Amino acid sequence: MIVRLLLWNLADSKTTLEELRPRLEPSPNRTWISDETTERFGVIETWDDEPGDFPQEIVDLIGKEPEIAERFDVEG
């Protein structure tokens, strides 16, 4: 199993958390996360195989790639 973590700083992006929230579609392998105080937004994804494509609509709305994009193997 693979876990992927993607994080954006929205302070210097083209959008806000309020604009993003209605576009966040539920998914069994995706957990959306945010911190309004620090204007950060992201997602934690779990995959049985290679991670799938991230919704391009979200990247386009934010206007940049994530500042942090990490992939981890699940050990247990």
Predicted regions and their residues:
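Short S/T/G/P-rich N-terminal loop/turn motif that feeds into the first structured element of a domain
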Residues: M1-G76
